């Protein structure tokens, strides 16, 4: 994502929403893994 540097100047909200979605996806992946 090349828009990281630009979003930092404008507003970090869009990036935060993306990271939140990534965190959700990671948690789902971890839960789906067999223990």
Swiss-Prot record:
Binds 1 heme b (iron(II)-protoporphyrin IX) group per subunit. One of its GO terms (molecular function) is metal ion binding. Residues 1-11 have a biased composition (Basic and acidic residues). It catalyses: 2 Mn(2+) + H2O2 + 2 H(+) = 2 Mn(3+) + 2 H2O. Keywords: Heme, Hydrogen peroxide, Iron, Manganese, Metal-binding, Oxidoreductase, Peroxidase. This is Manganese peroxidase. One of its GO terms (biological process) is hydrogen peroxide catabolic process. Induction: By incubation with textile industry wastewater. Has manganese peroxidase activity. Belongs to the peroxidase family. Residues 1-35 are annotated as: Disordered. Residues 18-35 have a biased composition (Polar residues). The keyword Heme applies. Its EC number is 1.11.1.13. Its cofactor is heme b; Ca(2+).
